[in-house]
Structure formats: C-alpha cells, structure tokens
C-alpha cells in the first residue's frame, strides 16, 4: 500500500501530489494577494509560489494551484511518481453536483490549472508536452478518475511568456466596476492575441462594451443578473454554495478552499451573531436581501463583457476553454483591468436550463 504523508507547500490543502512515498498537499484560498481585507495566512500561496527548490514540477505546480476554479474547489491531483512527468487527475471527491452536475465548469477550471502550469514551466525555459485524456474523454454526463492529462518534460527549451508575470496579480474581483471608465481601445485585440492558440482549435472570443454595443451589453447584464437569481432562489443550488462558504477569517484559515468570506467586516458580523449558515439559507433574510442588492449592483455596474465560445461541447473543448480563459484573464490583468467569471446562465441544472435556454442563444 502506498504510504501517504502530508507536507505543506503553502497554507492549507487542496492539490494532492502523489509521490513514491508521500503525498503533498497545498491550497489556494481564493483570496487576493496580501492586503488589509484578508488574513495574512490566507495569502500564503501567493507569497510562497515558486519558493521551493529542487523539482521543477513542484515549483510549477505552486503557480498552477492559483488558477481560478468554480467555488474554489481546486479539484486536482498531480501524480509525480514517474520522473519528469505529471499525471494530472480530477479529484472526484470535489464536485458540485447541484450547480455543475456534468462537471463542465470544474473541467474548465482544470484547463486554467494546466495553462498556469505551462506558463510556470516555460518561465524556467522548460518546455512541456501535454497529452489530454490519454484514456479517452470521460462521459459528457460525469467526470471520472481517469487522467485528464499527462504532462512530460520535453527535450527542447521554451521561451518565457510575458503573461507569467501576471499570475500573482490576477484575481477574480467581486466588487462593482467603474462604469465611467471606457474599455481601452486595444483591449479586444490584446485579448484575442492572448488566446491565439485556442482560436486555432475552434474557440472564439467575443467582447462587448458600452462603446461598441450598448444594447447587447444591457442584455448580457440582465442575463447574468437573472441567472444569479435563479441559482440563489433554487434551494439546493444555493445550499451547495452556502455549505462551501468560509465565514470569517478563522474559517478561511482553517479550511482555505470554497467561497471565502474572510475580512474584518465579516469577522465583526460573525462575532455579533449576525451571520451564520442557517441564516444564509433563508433567502428572504435581511442579510440575503442585502446580498441580492450587492450582487445586482455589481453585475449591473459592468462596463464591458467578454465571452469564449466553442464549436463543440466536447471535454477537450471544455479543457481548452479553461486554458483560453486563464490567458484572457492574465492579458486583462496586464492592462490594469479586472475580471470576474459570471457563468451561472450556462449551468445545466433544470431550473436554469428552463429559464435561459432560449434567451442565452439569442443574446450571444
């Protein structure tokens, strides 16, 4: 039987590295880089990325685990038992059966992980070859525990990509944006260049702003807000999110995965007994009414939107979409722009599909 030990690369636990004699575990809290609104311990992954010596794989993985992913579940396992190789698997214990029943969003997150992994390896002039789904694509209905990808070090050298420098700066920004600030004229072109490889594989980028099409932008704002409400008022999907909330700095540090609510504001609410999971399950509670108002303001204050579409919904296309999204987000960061993924309208649970199948096809 394989012996399993825990070695903390960063703070917490969410990427399992399988080695001949031990397992190594590390986690991205989903919190932004160090700042006054989050506990310092929760930012360890950003502060410690790339700090380990020795194996290039663990160094590259320390950046890959900062990848954006649904509900910050970080559903990845990296098997390092073969020298100079990473066998990348999906952790089937980390699933979102209510909001992501087919595992599409989680697989997109795995694509983000692979893109950051390659950027980090290339930064050290190490080229890698990535073979996806070596055992074949999983069912369109459910992911399995077969390898998502085999990553091998190549004999050639690689050139560093400027987007690597944005990995530690990128974050999903969940605050209202500045609607008065126009989208820089060069942005659509820069984002398209960032996902040039993905475009060759059938993916397309769309960008809309107040300058380019106010009607389409307004339609997308309404669509994202209405979809957020569907997920919120559907009891089982909202409960899935509430169960994954880490309320207060103590929970964020103890379990640095899931949806982080760690800041002095939430610490005070928790200490005063004004916020807890039971209360958050009541969608009509005063606190949740405030949350609705906050998210409506956030989504309606969106000066531009970007989307990625594929010619198929294959598992390979989903994985490549994640790689494209990671690059687009890093390219936006390089221009001083912030992004937040709002993909509720694409979720496959019945209530969402019934409400949005027609509308989302006509909008985009």
Q: Which functions belong to the PLM regions below?
A:
Residues 2-364:
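Acidic, surface-exposed loops and disordered segments
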């Amino acid at each position: 039987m394989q012996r399993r030990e825990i070695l903390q690369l960063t703070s917490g636990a969410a990427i399992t590295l399988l080695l001949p004699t031990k397992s190594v575990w590390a986690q991205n809290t989903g919190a932004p880089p160090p700042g006054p609104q989050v506990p310092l311990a929760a930012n360890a992954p950003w502060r410690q990325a790339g700090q380990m010596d020795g194996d290039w794989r663990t160094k590259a993985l320390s950046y890959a685990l900062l990848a954006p992913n649904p509900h910050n579940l970080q559903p990845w396992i990296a098997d390092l038992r073969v020298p100079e190789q990473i066998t990348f698997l999906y952790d089937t214990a980390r699933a979102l059966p209510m909001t992501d029943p087919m595992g599409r969003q989680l697989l997109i997150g795995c694509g983000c992980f692979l893109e950051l992994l390659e950027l980090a390896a290339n930064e050290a002039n190490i080229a890698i070859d990535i073979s996806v789904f070596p055992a074949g694509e999983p069912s369109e209905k459910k992911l399995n525990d077969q390898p998502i990808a085999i990553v091998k070090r190549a004999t050639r050298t690689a050139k560093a990509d400027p987007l690597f420098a944005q990995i530690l700066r990128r974050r999903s920004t969940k605050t209202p944006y500045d609607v008065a600030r126009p989208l820089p004229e060069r942005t659509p072109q820069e984002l398209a260049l960032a996902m040039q490889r993905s475009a060759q594989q059938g993916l397309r980028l769309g960008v809309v702003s107040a300058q380019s099409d106010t009607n389409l932008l307004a339609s997308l704002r309404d669509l994202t807000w209405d979809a957020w409400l569907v997920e919120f008022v559907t009891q089982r999907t909202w409960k899935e999110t509430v169960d994954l909330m880490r309320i207060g700095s103590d929970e964020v540090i103890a379990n640095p995965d899931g949806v982080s609510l760690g800041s002095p504001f939430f610490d005070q609410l928790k200490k005063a007994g004004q916020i807890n999971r039971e209360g958050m399950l009541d969608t009509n509670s005063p606190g949740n009414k405030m949350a609705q108002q906050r998210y409506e303001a956030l989504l309606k204050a969106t000066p531009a939107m970007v989307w990625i579409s594929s010619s198929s919904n294959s598992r390979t296309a989903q994985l490549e979409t994640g790689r494209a999204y990671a690059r687009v987000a890093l390219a936006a960061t390089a221009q001083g722009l912030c992004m937040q993924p709002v993909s509720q309208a694409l979720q496959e649970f019945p209530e969402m599909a019934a409400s949005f199948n027609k509308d989302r096809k006509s909008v985009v």
